[in-house]
Regions:
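Conserved short acidic donor-positioning loop in nucleotide-sugar-dependent glycosyltransferases
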Residues: 27, 41-43, 64
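Short, well-formed alpha-helical segments that are part of the catalytic scaffolds
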Residues: 15-29
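Acceptor/aglycone-binding surface of glycosyltransferases and processive sugar-polymer synthases
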Residues: 62-64, 68-75, 81, 93-123
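A conserved acidic beta->alpha catalytic loop
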Residues: 40-48, 89
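Donor nucleotide-sugar binding loop of glycosyltransferases
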Residues: 16-19, 43, 66
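Short, structured coil segments at secondary-structure junctions
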Residues: 32, 53-55
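Cell-envelope/extracellular polymer assembly enzymes that use nucleotide-activated donors
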Residues: 6-8, 35
Length: 123
């Protein structure tokens, strides 16, 4: 919950078996996320086992492709605020706070996980 509004995090997954659990656990400990949705887009074997060890809800999207996975996650999400994050370690859960800080003032807030300032990723 962020300022009285629910927060859903959507994580499309394909080859993130090794990082998915740590990513989900970091969102769980953040304390503001009401719903974690993992969109299994033909993910590597064992990914579902890692997801099952968390509070996340896993949904399957059989049509291959990032766009299909994102759309499926958006359809499934029930939060007032929706965050799309990559579960490969390039998006840190704490960066969601930086995005949500602007949510009251704008209809859409974007962050880049690839922007580099001082050699490090910043949102």
């Amino acid at each position: 919950m962020w300022q009285g509004k629910s927060v859903s995090v959507i994580l499309p997954t394909y080859n993130e078996k090794e990082s998915i659990r740590a990513s989900l656990e970091s969102f769980e400990t953040l304390g503001i996320v009401d719903e974690l949705i993992v969109v299994n887009n033909n993910a590597a074997p064992g990914t579902s086992d890692e997801v099952a060890r968390t509070s996340a809800r896993e949904v399957e999207e059989t049509r291959q492709g990032y766009g299909f996975a994102i759309r499926r996650g958006l359809d499934e999400a029930r939060g007032d605020y929706l965050i799309i994050a990559e579960p490969d370690g390039t998006f840190l859960a704490r960066d969601a706070l930086k995005l949500l800080a602007y949510a009251d003032d704008f209809d859409v807030v974007y962050g880049s996980r690839t922007a580099r300032i001082d050699g490090r990723a910043h949102v």
